């Protein structure tokens, strides 16, 4: 697994330098996304009815429901016993698990729609496996954004779900119309209406109907609806997910 990551140009142990190289490789996609925002047509979105039926969307993975799961750059495990008082407190899924929860949601969706046998018997077991894989392959809480690279590579290399960074709002609409769930990173401040929240949060875009996007977040048990043009303007980067 580590060798596979290295062969893609991503070092097993990610650093800020690795992150800079990754950003440079996708900067053109980010630029084209921003340019496409100038072509937003509200009337177009109001007439769209595309995407995955709510009937097929799994219950969202709410990271708040996994407070007993440790997940940071050192390890990932179920915390049934006291771990003492480390110099740097351990983080839990509840406070830092937005990306693994989004990845788990995508994985469960494809298992359901393709009617495949479950490899993981519980949601907690799946989330623990994803989180452990992230930690072992370079996720580092000290380095902002390294989890973006991990998401990009691990969904495909480990779970067989290729991802493609969306280069424009039209790319994304096409992906949604093709019933490919899209993971998007948005400002936590916008998502929760609190300007004091400075991080990013992963959401999943499932459908676009009547000018609204149907999304799931990793901090709620239910689906939500947001104005699609506002959503597009707040997306930092997005990945369409599909099964080959």
Q: Where do the protein language model's features map onto the residues?
A:
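Active-site-adjacent structural segments surrounding the nucleophilic cysteine of cysteine proteases
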Residues: 4-142
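Conserved active-site-adjacent core of cysteine acyl-enzyme catalytic domains
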Residues: 11, 18-20, 108-112, 117-244
């Amino acid at each position: 697994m580590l060798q596979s990551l290295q062969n893609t140009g991503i070092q097993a142990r990610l650093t800020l330098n690795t992150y800079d190289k990754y950003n440079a490789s996708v900067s053109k996609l980010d630029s084209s996304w921003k340019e496409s925002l100038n072509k937003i047509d509200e009337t177009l979105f109001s007439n769209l009815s595309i995407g995955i039926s709510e009937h097929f969307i799994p219950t969202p993975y709410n990271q708040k429901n996994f407070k007993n799961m440790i997940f940071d750059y050192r390890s990932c495990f179920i915390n049934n016993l006291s771990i003492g008082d480390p110099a740097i407190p351990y983080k839990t899924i509840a406070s830092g698990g937005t990306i693994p929860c989004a990845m788990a949601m995508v994985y469960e969706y494809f298992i359901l729609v393709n009617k495949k046998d479950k490899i993981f018997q519980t949601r907690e077991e799946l989330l623990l496996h994803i989180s452990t894989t992230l930690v072992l392959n370079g996720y580092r809480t000290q380095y902002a954004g390294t989890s973006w690279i991990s998401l990009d590579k691990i969904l495909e290399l480990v779970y067989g779900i290729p991802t493609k960074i969306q280069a424009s709002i039209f790319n994304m609409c096409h992906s949604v119309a093709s019933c490919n769930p899209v993971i998007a990173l948005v400002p936590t401040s916008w998502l929760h209406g609190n300007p004091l929240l400075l991080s990013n949060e992963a959401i999943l875009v499932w459908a676009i109907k009547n000018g609204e996007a149907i999304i799931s977040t990793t901090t709620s048990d239910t689906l939500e609806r947001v104005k699609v043009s506002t959503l597009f303007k707040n997306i930092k980067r997005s990945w369409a997910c599909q099964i080959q």
